């Protein structure tokens, strides 16, 4: 049985690519045609890729792999957090900070600082500080929560990165590849399929398309960890 149907993808607008002048020729194998100056993605091939991605992701989850969802564009941000939380993955959905993977020791120290500040806030320790000092600590807490809140459960580097919008998340791609962390990537027609291990050709700008793909990948992770009936 297919992981996702052609009608579901059509309804989500997953077949709409970018303007033909903005394409990457390496994506030609996944393009069906062009209409009104816009490339149309071959959803039959997308369905095949989704099946492969689902099976691969489920297998990785079954073997205990840890996942990091990355997508910082406005229309993907909420979905990234929602689906990552649903399957117990970590996530980055506001801004990719340089060194999040390649400078993990420093990043982990900042995550630990976030946890310390949250403990101080919940215990009332910040409220007991002088007003000015308390305000400084709360601003630091808010900033760390915004950018690192999705990483609090990540005690070490992820085994797999799930990516929305390869072009926007260039630094995340480079860091993952430098560390040989496999990438499961949504690929629009302006992307490079050679820069990921598990490609999913589809519209990475439409919220419904992002929701559909990440939702299925989250399902795969949950199935791998808990079984299909849990």
Swiss-Prot record:
Claim: Ribonucleoprotein is one of the keywords in the record: yes
PANTHER family named in the record: 30S RIBOSOMAL PROTEIN S2 PROKARYOTIC AND ORGANELLAR, SMALL RIBOSOMAL SUBUNIT PROTEIN US2M
Gene Ontology BP, a term: translation
SUPFAM superfamilies referenced in this protein's UniProt entry, alphabetically: Ribosomal protein S2 (SSF52313)
CDD domains recorded: RPS2
Family annotation (InterPro entries): Ribosomal_uS2, Ribosomal_uS2_bac/mit/plastid, Ribosomal_uS2_CS, Ribosomal_uS2_flav_dom_sf
Lineage, top ranks: Bacteria, Bacillati, Cyanobacteriota, Cyanophyceae, Synechococcales
Taxonomic superkingdom: Bacteria
Keywords: Ribonucleoprotein, Ribosomal protein
GO cellular component: cytosolic small ribosomal subunit
Designated gene of the protein: rpsB
Family to which this protein belongs: Belongs to the universal ribosomal protein uS2 family.
Protein name listed in UniProt: Small ribosomal subunit protein uS2
Gene3D superfamilies registered for this protein in UniProt: Glucose-6-phosphate isomerase like protein, domain 1, Helix hairpin bin
MF terms (GO), sorted A to Z: structural constituent of ribosome
Pfam families recorded: Ribosomal_S2
